[in-house]
Swiss-Prot record:
This is Bradykinin-potentiating peptide 10 g-AP. Keywords: Hypotensive agent, Secreted, Toxin. Bradykinin-potentiating peptide. Shows poor inhibition over ACE (Ki=1 mM). In vivo, potentiates bradykinin activity by increasing its edema-inducing activity in rat paw. May also potentiate the hypotensive effects of bradykinin. The lineage of its organism: Eukaryota, Metazoa, Chordata, Craniata, Vertebrata. It comes from the Eukaryota. GO terms for molecular function: toxin activity. It comes from Bitis rhinoceros (West African gaboon viper).
Length: 12
């Protein structure tokens, strides 16, 4: 089952 994920972490 697909997992609900948030936005990808973008390094500074």
């Amino acid at each position: 089952a697909p997992q609900e994920r948030g936005p990808p972490e973008i390094p500074p």
